Amino acid sequence: MSNLTYLQGYPEQLLSQVRTLINEQRLGDVLAKRYPGTHDYATDKALWQYTQDLKNQFLRNAPPINKVMYDNKIHVLKNALGLHTAVSRVQGGKLKAKVEIRVATVFRNAPEPFLRMIVVHELAHLKEKEHNKAFYQLCCHMEPQYHQLEFDTRLWLTQLSLGQNKI
């Protein structure tokens, strides 16, 4: 139980509260009360439209996104929740860049705020490549509750990994 993989780096006092919720088997209930239901973006096409809507709202001048999809290999292979890639190819003597965003399949059945947090995170990489202060400021600009949602997403993933009742 001391190995809370998704919550490493958080203060011990906070981890103690999480352990209490886990021991009392209340973590799933707390999350379900805070984030009832799931989102309607279960297909790659719906995810692409959702991502485009957020991009057009906050990052109009960012490079276009060529592909957005759920990827069932992300979690296992990369130990990540989402990936952004920019692939450069030579096409007719010119260099073309293609931008892709991939979201872990586990978010297909997640509450909408958790999906939003992941998409906002990956969109922020269009402007800021590194996880620095400017990156997190951009995330908070697009989603004011970004840090709370990131923590709650980590709680949700912890709860899923323990096999407790799901949201």
Curated annotation (Swiss-Prot):
SS bond list: none
CDD domains the record matches: M48_yhfN_like
GO biological process: nucleotide metabolic process
Catalysed reaction, written as an equation: UTP + H2O = UMP + diphosphate + H(+)
Enzyme class per UniProt: hydrolase
MF annotations from Gene Ontology: nucleotide binding; UTP diphosphatase activity
InterPro entries: UTP_pyrophosphatase-like (IPR053136), YgjP-like_metallopeptidase (IPR002725)
EC number of the protein: 3.6.1.-
Pfam families listed in its UniProt record: YgjP-like
Protein keywords: Hydrolase, Nucleotide metabolism, Nucleotide-binding
Function statement: Specifically catalyzes the hydrolysis of UTP to UMP and diphosphate in vitro, albeit at apparently slow rate. Shows no activity towards ATP, GTP, CTP, dTTP and ITP as substrates.
Name of the protein in question: UTP pyrophosphatase
